[in-house]
Regions:
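Structural signature for solvent-exposed beta-strand/loop edge elements and short helix-capping sites
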Residues: 128-137, 143, 170
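Short, flexible helix-coil linker/hinge segments at the edges of structured domains or between repeats
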Residues: 216, 221-241, 329-346
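Sec-dependent N-terminal signal peptides
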Residues: 4-14
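Flexible, glycine/proline-enriched loop segments at strand-loop-helix junctions
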Residues: 135-137, 171-178, 244-247
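Beta-barrel outer-membrane channel/assembly domains of diderm bacteria
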Residues: 8, 19-123, 129-130, 145-164, ...
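Outer-membrane beta-barrel proteins
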Residues: 90, 94-96, 172-178, 276-289
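Exposed, low-structure sequence patches enriched in small/polar residues
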Residues: 40, 63, 198-203, 208-212, ...
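Short acidic, glycine/serine/threonine-rich loops at helix termini
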Residues: 129-131, 173-175, 220-224, 320-322
Length: 601
């Protein structure tokens, strides 16, 4: 089936390219359609084992994640398909990713105020607290739904979405282990300002949203057997009887979301609340607890200044289409909780990235102030100075010990009101999960030279975020970046970074040089150094008693021509986490030759 689908996709690619050529040649009928597509191929080869950085031994000497996508559209119709080849996936992608085929295809039609999609699609309700499907290839995320989506705009200011389907789970959508989950949902969004003339005249925008999602898990997951406390007591010893017990997993899990977004002039306020019914799964340890999330956000912006304040409280909001999905993977999440921590782009500032703790939950706060000191002032200088301060603080939920119940048989009854732990709404734990305070300064010194500086102080709870033993990591990070333009075609950019900590692997240094030669070439070399990298044994175990001084050197050449981009280089990378939007994937250390090719048309 996969071979047939792949062959069909390639045939469509050839036919589409032919159609594109005909359109360019002037055939009148073909001009009504537009063809868009892309090819992306990332390759790692010539890998070698290095116990100093813990690469382990790779069975595959040639690894690639390759995607080819086509979309054909006109005013009323759109169709597309994506071919994926991951038979030998890149490091960090679990074995379930192995395979190739056409896992994504769709047709879409729209007329006046209605739009219908059949096949695979992505969408989001509100901020995604109860529903978000999206693709993030670097993290191995594709939780699209295969089914139908209907979007309606029947009246002015009214937007309606109705959808349903089966979620992608690696290469499967249904009948995996006799389990075929179905997800249904609807969203209503009202733009009140379009009905009230005075609001529009006063530059006021008010949007109200209401969403609902239901997930039917399938017959195979209606009961799950587990080993533990059966809830019965031995009459002789008066101790709990340990053994196999059966969990009655709810066949249907419902979630609801309400939100309001008010914009008035330079001000913007958002309030959103989500609720989820009892949803025992591997993510929360199979407890019967209702999920809740409250998110508040306020911002103010004007020319030269902006302020952002956010707060979020989430509790047991891991919403997945399959209850037994591995907790350590990103597969089959129906929802997404926005990250309330800054997503750093500098290498050492992102050395300890934070992953949102969906279970048991978290309190998260973020604030940001950006200010532009005007030109020809004491702090602005000749060209002005941009300063940005960001603060994020995330900690655990506090619980009421007096309300904590014993683990008895009632805990495993989905209809029981008893919950294992009670978390009072305003109570916070003493455990800090993550904290980041950073200051960035961007300064244009002259027409040819630009400088950027950053200082960050971070606290990272390795036990909570990575489930590893160890103390909280306190780190100080300094970054200096400069960009100098030698000529209209030649620019040199450099980075110098330093991270100081007394925990984990102690201090890190990083340096980078990047030479851009327009319009085609870019040359990059970087080195990340640490003097306390623990040795890895031949069987993959870490020996902390033996450490090494290691240079993680990376070099590449990038060639760009039109819509083609080819990058070739050598990489020696440390083990770590690749994160985006509070979602992370572990990537093991590796050493080898890399190549990346992209083409868009």
């Amino acid at each position: 089936m996969k071979r047939f689908a792949a062959t069909t996709a390639l045939a469509l690619l050839g036919a589409a390219l032919s159609l594109h050529a005909q359109s360019e040649g002037g055939i009148e009928g073909a001009k009504k359609f537009t063809l868009h597509g892309s090819i992306q191929s990332d390759v790692l080869t010539a890998v070698s084992q290095d116990n100093k950085i813990g690469t382990g031994e790779y069975d595959d000497k040639f690894m690639t994640n390759t995607y080819a996508e086509l979309n054909l559209l006109n005013k009323y119709f759109q169709a597309g398909a994506r071919l994926e080849y991951l038979d030998h996936p890149l490091p960090g992608f679990e074995n379930d990713f192995k395979g190739w085929g056409v896992p994504n295809f769709y047709v879409k039609g729209n007329y006046k105020w209605a739009e219908l999609t059949l096949g695979d699609f992505y969408d989001q309700f509100g901020s995604g607290l109860i529903f978000r499907t999206y693709e993030e290839r670097s993290l191995g995320i594709d939780n699209s739904l295969r089914g139908a989506r209907l979007a309606l705009k029947p009246l002015k200011g009214v937007n309606i979405k109705l959808l349903g389907g089966q979620q992608r789970y690696y290469w499967h959508h249904r009948n995996l282990d006799n389990c075929s989950p179905w997800t249904w949902g609807g969203d209503l969004e009202l733009n009140v300002d379009q009905w009230v003339k005075k609001m529009d005249e006063n530059n006021t925008r008010l949007t109200l949203g209401f969403s609902g999602v239901s997930n039917h898990k399938g017959e195979a997951e209606s009961t799950i057997s587990r080993l533990g406390n059966t809830g019965e007591t031995d009459p002789i010893t008066d101790k709990p009887i340990m053994g196999l017990y059966t969990l009655n997993i709810p066949k249907d899990v419902a979630a609801f979301d309400v939100r309001a977004n008010l914009q008035k002039g330079n001000y913007n306020f958002l309030a959103e609340y989500a609720w989820k019914s009892q949803d025992p799964s591997s993510s929360n340890g199979y407890i019967y607890k209702r999920g809740k999330t409250l998110m508040l956000s306020g911002s103010y912006s004007k020319r030269g200044m902006s302020v952002l304040l956010q707060a979020k409280r989430s509790e047991d909001m891991a919403f997945r289409s399959r209850a037994t999905a591995d907790k350590g993977t990103n597969a089959c999440y129906i929802n997404h909780l926005p990250a309330f921590s800054m997503q750093h782009t500098y290498a050492l500032a992102s050395l300890y990235p934070y992953a949102t703790q969906m279970t048991p939950g978290e309190w998260a706060f973020q604030g940001e102030l950006a200010y532009n000191f005007k030109r020809r002032t004491a702090l602005g200088g000749k060209y002005g100075t941009n300063v940005k301060v960001n603060f994020s603080h995330i900690r655990g939920l506090g619980y009421d010990k007096s309300a904590t119940t014993e683990t008895t048989s009632t805990v495993f009854d989905p209809k029981a009101e008893t919950e294992t732990v009670n978390y009072p709404f305003f109570k916070m734990s003493n455990s800090v999960y993550y904290q980041d305070v950073n200051v960035q300064i961007d300064k244009k010194v002259s027409k040819l030279l630009k400088l950027n500086f950053m200082y960050a102080y971070q606290r990272y709870n390795i036990k909570v975020v990575k489930n590893e033993s160890g103390p909280i990591i306190n780190s100080h990070i300094l970054v200096a970046e400069g960009k100098y333009q030698f000529s209209p075609k030649i620019t040199l950019r450099g980075e110098a970074q330093y991270l100081h900590t007394k925990q984990d692997q102690k201090d890190w240094w990083f340096g980078l040089l990047e030479l851009s030669v327009l319009p085609n070439f870019m040359f990059t070399i970087s080195d990340q150094f640490n003097a306390h990298v623990p040795m890895s044994t031949s069987d993959g175990q870490i020996d902390p008693s033996v450490t090494n001084k290691v240079h993680y050197i990376t070099g590449s050449v990038t060639f760009t021509q039109g819509s083609h981009r080819l990058q070739v280089g050598y990489a020696k990378t440390r083990a770590g986490y690749n994160c985006s939007g509070g979602v992370c994937r572990y990537v093991p250390a590796y050493k080898g030759l890399q190549a990346s090719y992209t083409f868009n048309f």
